[in-house]
Amino acid sequence: MGGFFGVASKSDCVFDLFFGTDYHSHLGTKRGGMVVYGKDGFERAIHNIENAPFRTKFEHDVDEMKGNLGIGCISDTEPQPLIVRSHLGNFAISTVGRINNIDALVKEAFTNGTTHFLEMSGGDINPTELTAALINRRDSIPEGIRYAQSVIDGSMSMLLLTPEGIYAARDRLGRLPVLVGKHPDGSLCVSFESFAYHKLGYED
């Protein structure tokens, strides 16, 4: 399983991103990650959280990261978010879900010109990387998200962070929630669970 949290703010978002992601810690026990975008571009931190909680592992990163846009995740499988450079531009991506037909999609990707995927421990393909590759098969991020959702057998919710903003997509059949909250200061967030943003002063 896992969970994710994203923030779009006119000011620095790192505080809200840190705690919003941390509030999803009960959904995963292996990896945690955050990416922010600001004047210096993308900044990312990923840590193993198997032997120490998210908050402890990321407290030093929070002091160094700066940005008004950010996404974070708790993952029970692969390290993420990933930062991708493609014909669609640079973006960071985080996913929650399961791809049942991953082998067929990888085989099709090789047939259509994708040259390689990075293997994780155990020989598995990173499903977040595969999702990014599917998105990149189209001419825009929204079209790519719709395409990925149409060919994935399973359930895949995702957050994409670009220099312009955040794309949030619930899985095609609505099995997993994606909720949007608004703060009185105008900041917006997207979350896997509403209590995570309620604790930060965001409203439904």
Language model regions located:
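Conserved short alpha-helical segments that host acidic/polar catalytic motifs at enzyme active sites
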Residues: M1-D204
